[in-house]
């Protein structure tokens, strides 16, 4: 049925219940301003929903067992946007991250993620036109890759921890 419950810690749930648990459509708000609106299963965020953080960040997409899991879109007030796959609350699988205002404004990464970091095959394009296409490990260029400059010059070779390393050609 429908109901409303306020927890001793200040969390407030308004929505559907089943067997005394949050289950179905509902809204969960916290005293610090976080808000989740969407599907619940057995007292956990599960299915489609939107989580809005008190600082303005927002995740809209799939949840499983209380965590971001499946396809989702993350946005922040400065314009950062990630659209892609999540697993156990982290960016995992294929995704696109576009940077908003700040140090990396206009930069974009398209590729694979593991545990929230760029990992696997991916392409990073800087706002000045420079581009790296190749292998990534733990958020850094690592393995075989091609770095292209705006004027067309290229470096093709090996990378380690974000730096040119080993054999390569210009």
Describe every region a protein language model picked out.
Residues 5-6, 28-29, 51-52, 74-75, ...:
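Hydrophobic face of amphipathic alpha-helices that form TPR/SEL1-like repeat modules
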Residues 8, 18, 41, 52-54, ...:
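Compositionally biased, low-structure terminal segments
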Residues 12-23, 35-46, 58-69, 81-92, ...:
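Conserved anchor residues at repeat-unit boundaries in beta-strand-based tandem repeats, strongest
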């Amino acid at each position: 049925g429908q109901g409303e419950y306020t927890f001793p810690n200040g969390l407030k749930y308004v929505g559907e219940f089943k067997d005394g648990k949050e289950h179905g459509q509902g809204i969960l708000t916290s005293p610090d301003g976080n808000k989740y609106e969407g599907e619940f299963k057995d007292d956990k965020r599960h299915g489609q929903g939107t989580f809005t953080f008190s600082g303005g960040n927002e995740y809209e997409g799939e949840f499983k067992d209380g965590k971001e899991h499946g396809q989702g879109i993350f946005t922040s007030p400065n314009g950062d946007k990630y659209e892609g796959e999540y697993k156990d609350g982290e960016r995992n699988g294929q995704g696109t991250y576009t940077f908003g205002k700040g140090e990396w404004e206009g930069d974009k990464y398209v590729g694979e993620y593991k545990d929230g970091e760029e990992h696997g095959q991916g392409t990073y394009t800087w706002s000045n036109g420079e581009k790296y296409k190749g292998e990534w490990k733990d958020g850094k260029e690592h393995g075989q890759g091609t770095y292209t400059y705006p004027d067309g010059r290229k470096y093709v070779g090996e990378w380690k921890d974000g730096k040119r390393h080993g054999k390569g050609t210009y």
